[in-house]
Amino acid sequence: MEQKMFCFQCEQTLGCTGCTGSAGVCGKKADTAKLQDELTGALIGLARAVDGAQTISKRTGQIIIEGLFTTVTNVSFDNAAIEKMIQKVRAEKERLVPDCSSCQSPCGKTDEYDMRQLWNADEDIRSLKSLILFGIRGMAAYAYHANVLNYEDAEVDQFFCEALFRIGYEESVERLLPTVLKVGEINLKCMALLDKANTQTYGTPEPTAVTLAVEKGPFIVVTGHDLKDLQLLLEQTEGKGINIYTHGEMLPAHAYPFLKKFSHLKGHFGTAWQNQQKEFDHLPAPILYTTNCLMP
């Protein structure tokens, strides 16, 4: 039977082999999965357009980061938004290599990549390229959140382009292994970048007791990773008699001195992101969902 989708990028994937039906375990529909593959193929086409190893501009780097981040689990289930991102990537490629689209003798060197080539590749090649792809997708989440706070690293941005180029290129196991190892190396730099962004913006985290009790009165729950979104909400609700509670992976926010100074950041509600539907079902409060903990 023909697969409606194929996705195995998260640890919850069906049967530890891959989600192939009409929807994934995360709730992602097959049409969304196909659009994410199309977006990834467009990003590889953009990397091909700059030949992978050339120095890229800040603008191109940010588009690549945003595009990769869009394909991360629980970031976006909005098909219209994904299609818009695909067009943004294609427009950037057209800006960089305008003659390719009108070339009378196309060489194919800047073509978009068909992700079915990867999913149906030799097992070892598929495994190594998937390690690279899923590694840079996760890294893109760190880079994106750092960028939101106006922190960036040119070496990190450049590696996203290099890695995408390698995924779309016919490579041997021996030639792919150094890139796999470099994913880990650059990921450490990217984690350091995000840590620098968070600590220089919100202070160095310190041990903090966090209550799990919800007080009487109006409140808002915030789930996800985006500290900037939480900051904006705290500033907009200050002095209005509305308490704020974190959920899931937003728990560490309570440890940052800048954020904990808001007295209406009261505590933490619930458990992990995958329990949202059960925990939020009868919650008498609005919920602010931030990336990357969205569930449809």
Spans of model-derived segments:
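Metallocofactor- and cofactor-centric catalytic cores in central/energy metabolism, strongly enriched
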Residues: 2-296
